Amino acid sequence: MMEADKKLVIRNATMEDLFVVAAVEAECFPVSEAATEAEFRERIACYGGHFWLLFEDERLVSFVDGMVTDQEDLTDEMYERAELHQEAGEWQMIFGVNTIPSCRHQGYAGRLLQQAIADAKEQGRKGLVLTCKDALIPYYAKFGFVNEGVSESVHGNVVWYQMRLRF
């Protein structure tokens, strides 16, 4: 099926999306890095409007999520404590950029990042912050994110680089 024939829908998350969001996360990240169903339950309850879900023919294939805060740097504590979300915060944090393996390299994650960037700008944020592994630095740079160096994060016991997009 050609992409033109596929019905693509981008929307925010509701609690009804909990199980499919957790399933996609489990398919995309190792257990040591993946958020749990319980963590997603808290995140969706606190900031479901800061989840961007992409459905292809009614199947969730990609999502981006993260809280908003006045803190300038993304910390490991943010992953674990959804209640730290500040709806009027200055920075949109991006915790995860997920696309199921069979749907990668079709631009889905990029569409969601562009939507998250547009929404953050429209909401008057200072910008967005994410952490990534070194191999993904050039990918995020294409969207205007600047590498700020090694993050203090020890999430999943790997080295993360903090990247920031300022408006």
What is each of the regions a protein language model found here?
Residues 103-115:
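Conserved acetyl-CoA pyrophosphate-binding loop and the N-cap/start of the following alpha-helix
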Residues 13, 97-99:
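Hydrophobic adenine-recognition pocket in adenosine-nucleotide-binding enzymes
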Residues 7-21:
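A short beta-loop-alpha structural element at the N-terminal edge
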Residues 31-57, 63-84:
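Active-site rim helix/loop that mediates acceptor-substrate recognition in acyltransferases
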Residues 63-97, 104, 154-159:
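Conserved acyl-donor/pantetheine-binding loop and adjacent beta-alpha core of acyl/acetyltransferases
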Residues 113, 120-132:
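Conserved GNAT acetyl-CoA-binding A-motif
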Residues 100, 133:
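Residue-level recognition of the GNAT/N-acetyltransferase active site
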Residues 69-71, 131, 141, 146-162:
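Conserved catalytic-core motifs of GNAT/GCN5-like acyltransferases
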